[in-house]
Swiss-Prot record:
HAMAP family linked to this entry: UreD
Superkingdom of origin: Bacteria
Species whose genome carries this gene: Haemophilus influenzae (strain PittGG)
Protein name: Urease accessory protein UreD
Main location: cytoplasm
Amino acid sequence: MNSKLSLSTKLSSNGKTQLAEYFAMPPFKVITLPSYDDAWANGLNAMQMSSSPGVLAGDLLEIDISLAKLTALSLNTQAFTRVQAMNEGDSAMQTTHILLAENSRLFYLPHPLVLHKDSVFKQKTLIEMDEQSELIYGEIVAIGRVLNDERFAFRQFSSHLKIYALQNDGKKRPLVSDCIQWLPSKMNLTALSQMENYSHQGSLTYLNLAKNNAEIKQQVQALQQQSAEEKDLLIGISQLNEYGLMVRVLGCRAEQIQKLFEKIGRLLKSV
């Protein structure tokens, strides 16, 4: 199935973020949520939903998100995304393109991805950021249905994330390039420095083009102190070359990583 979700934002006359354009093909759907107590006072809260039991063989999923100048969007998902079993030679793919205009802010944290036995899933995410924009973007993936004794029973998983800063001359400067490639039949993914005995991996990328390296360093140190209190998680927090940081987490419970990223998101929104 070919499915597409496209949405953009605009600023209302009273300075609040609204949906400007919205288009969704089944199984995608987006609903707006009430405004909660959020550090992004003018922001819009929304939920990305799906009526499908999961990602199936042959699925081509496309997500396009565009934020207008001065708008802020917090986008979550309804439930876990399950990549269902596939015949040999079949696969599914998702491409995501995000464009952040000047002084816009996006928090995007999809629920964890669960890789079922014999599944093949490839995803590519491209994010382009204009001046003074801010991004909090997370990904969480489970190695299988562990309670069903499925551990690394999928065939392949790949995730490519590329983030660029837009420049006045029309060129793009690379900020982040991150690649995960899992081939269980060819890789020892339980080895040291790989997944070891953990079953879930999460990564959270934070970029704020209005902050300098000294300010980012303070945020890294604050998060490192906070993460020391977390139990049963292996957490690494690194400062990027410029404008941001990345959090990488290994754990055994998806909900624990999800709650950690939500907590970090609230902290980053408030500084």
